[in-house]
Amino acid sequence: MSRIGLQQLNNSARNSPFGSEKATGTKQIPEPLKLTAQLKKYQPITPSPLASATTITPVLSPFDVFCDDDQEAKNVETQMFEYGTVSTQTIINVPHVQPKITEADLTSEKPTVNYLRVMADRLQMDLDDEMDRNQRLVAELGDLDEKMRKIDDDTEILLEVLADIDEEQQTDEEIGTAQL
């Protein structure tokens, strides 16, 4: 380790491209690349004559199309591209043919695939019916809760009116007994 001022340089700072530069305040300039035999095999590639024959120049507006030199810019400016997404949804209805249970399905030792399919279809239909019934009952319950809240509000109003009537009757009785 070496000390420069109050900063210490360790091996990692010396190996770092920035650590020693910060500490010493000097900037190291990298050496230029030397052409070796390995690098000489990488020669620049001359472009193809086909690529150099066609030059593409941009037109003035960013919405215009790039055109070749031999094409007129006047025609290019009038060209328009319309982009749009087109999606089609195909609904395929496959009629469900429920298999029939035969005597062999009922009398076999193990349940057959046909029997299990029929039972699964029946269970699915029962489940769908129960889900519909459940939705109806939830809607009815919501309506009943709303009616119950309205009845509670009406009851509170009636109780307040009765309390006011009782207070008026008591004050009338007190006034009537006070006058006698």
UniProtKB/Swiss-Prot annotation:
**GO CC annotations on file:** cytoplasm; nucleus
GO biological process entries: negative regulation of cell cycle; negative regulation of DNA replication
SUPFAM superfamilies given for it?
A: Geminin coiled-coil domain
Keywords assigned by UniProt?
Cytoplasm, DNA replication inhibitor, Nucleus
| Region Disordered, annotated ranges | 1-29
Q: What happens when the gene is disrupted?
A: RNAi-mediated knockdown results in sterility in 20% of animals. Sterile animals have severe oogenesis defects and partially differentiated germ cells accumulate in the proximal arm of the gonad. Furthermore, germ nuclei in the distal region of the gonad are enlarged, and their nucleoli are misshapen. Sterile animals also have mitotic defects whereby pairs of chromosome bridge, which is indicative of a defect in coordination between endoreduplication and the nuclear division cycle.
Which cellular compartments is it found in?
Cytoplasm; Nucleus
* One MF annotation (Gene Ontology) recorded for this entry: DNA-binding transcription factor binding
- Show which residues constitute the signal peptide: none
- What spans are recorded as compositionally biased (Polar residues)? 1-27
Q: Which family does it belong to?
A: Belongs to the geminin family.
Biological role: Inhibits DNA replication by binding to the DNA replication licensing factor cdt-1. Its interaction with cdt-1 prevents the cdt-1 loading of the mini-chromosome maintenance (MCM) complex onto DNA and therefore DNA replication licencing.
Q: How does it assemble?
A: Homodimer. Interacts with cdt-1; the interaction most likely inhibits the ability of cdt-1 to load the mini-chromosome maintenance (MCM) complex onto DNA and therefore reduces DNA replication licensing activity. Interacts with nob-1 and ceh-32.
What's the name of the protein?
Geminin homolog
Its source organism is Caenorhabditis elegans
The gene name on file is gmn-1
